[in-house]
Design a protein with these regions (language model features):
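Tandem repeat scaffolds
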Residues: 1-349
């Protein structure tokens, strides 16, 4: 089918159902609002086409070229898009549902408010792409190249990002929830306001990274590195990790409430007014840390090393300190007897 015939059919509201248009030359065509169902469109040339608000349902588009195409609010449902080329394409509000996008190219594409749901993006390229307010849910992004990409207000939920790289990426209030980020390096990135709640960050590297107001609530942080990170007001409530390295980090007024951090290292960290209530800090090292006004009420500090730490008016109410070493304990606030009695009180029948 010639490009002009396809454009005419679409403009008249005809559904392109089951047609074989493989290797079709449709560059710069106008097919906005077109509906394609179970069509064979492998290796078609859609470069610079205007396909805004078009629908591709259960189509085969392997190796298709959409370079520079206008795909604003286009829908791809259960499509085969392996090796498809979307470089420099405009995909604002586009939807990809249950699509195969392995080795697809999205370099420098605009993906503002785009949605990827239950898609396979393994080995794809997002290099230089802009993901603003995009949503990626239940997707596999194994070995994806996202270097120099921008993630602004983007939400990633229950995805596998194993071996994904994002060197030089820019992130602003991005959300990674229940997502596997094992061993991921965030070195050189600015992550202010990003959310990592209930994510698996085992062995992740945040060394020297800006983490202002980041949220790690409920995350797994075994062996993660936060040394020299800057994260005032960061949230680690309910997070858990053994041997986490927070040494020399600047975490003023961060919340570690009910966190599980046995054998963690906070040596030399700035933990001014941090909240560690009900936290597990057994065998942790806080040597030389700034703990002024820190709150350790009901925390477990058994065998913790707090030598040379500044503990001016740090709260130790109800904390377990068996075999803990504290050279500045005299300036801390010990258990308040009246408050302890009130906490043990139960209303009589």
């Amino acid at each position: 089918m010639k490009a002009e015939h396809l454009s005419l059919a679409v403009s008249m509201g005809e559904t392109i159902d089951g047609l074989d248009l493989r290797k079709g030359q449709f560059a710069k065509i106008f097919i906005d609002g077109g509906v394609f169902t179970q069509a064979q469109l492998d290796e078609c040339d859609w470069r610079d086409a205007d396909a805004r608000e078009s629908v591709f349902d259960r189509c085969k588009l392997q190796g298709a070229m959409f370079n520079g195409a206008n795909l604003r609010r286009a829908v791809f449902n259960q499509c085969e898009l392996a090796h498809a080329d979307f470089r420099n394409a405009h995909l604002h509000g586009a939807t990809f549902s249950e699509c195969t996008l392995t080795h697809a190219q999205f370099a420098a594409a605009w993906l503002g408010m785009a949605t990827f749901s239950r898609c396979r993006l393994d080995h794809a390229s997002l290099a230089g792409a802009t993901l603003e307010s995009a949503v990626i849910t239940d997707c596999s992004l194994i070995d994806v190249n996202a270097d120099d990409s921008e993630w602004k207000h983007t939400c990633v939920l229950q995805c596998d990002l194993a071996q994904l790289t994002w060197a030089g990426a820019r992130m602003t209030r991005a959300v990674f929830t229940k997502t596997a980020l094992i061993g991921k390096s965030f070195a050189g990135l600015v992550l202010d306001g990003c959310q990592f709640s209930f994510a698996d960050l085992t062995g992740a590297d945040f060394a020297g990274v800006s983490l202002k107001q980041c949220n790690f609530q409920g995350s797994v942080l075994d062996g993660a590195h936060f040394n020299h990170a800057v994260g005032p007001h960061a949230l680690f409530c309910g997070a858990q990790g053994e041997g986490v390295d927070f040494s020399n980090a600047k975490l003023r007024q961060a919340l570690f409430t009910a966190g599980q951090f046995p054998s963690a290292r906070f040596d030399g960290a700035d933990l001014y007014q941090c909240h560690f209530a009900n936290a597990n800090l057994v065998d942790a090292s806080l040597a030389g840390a700034e703990l002024t006004y820190a709150d350790f009420r009901h925390a477990d500090l058994s065998r913790a090393d707090l030598r040379q730490a500044t503990m001016f008016r740090a709260t130790l109410h109800g904390a377990r300190t068996d075999e803990a070493q504290m050279t500045d304990r005299s300036r801390a606030l010990e258990t308040d007897p009246e408050l302890a009695r009130a906490e043990r009180w139960t209303a009589s029948a």
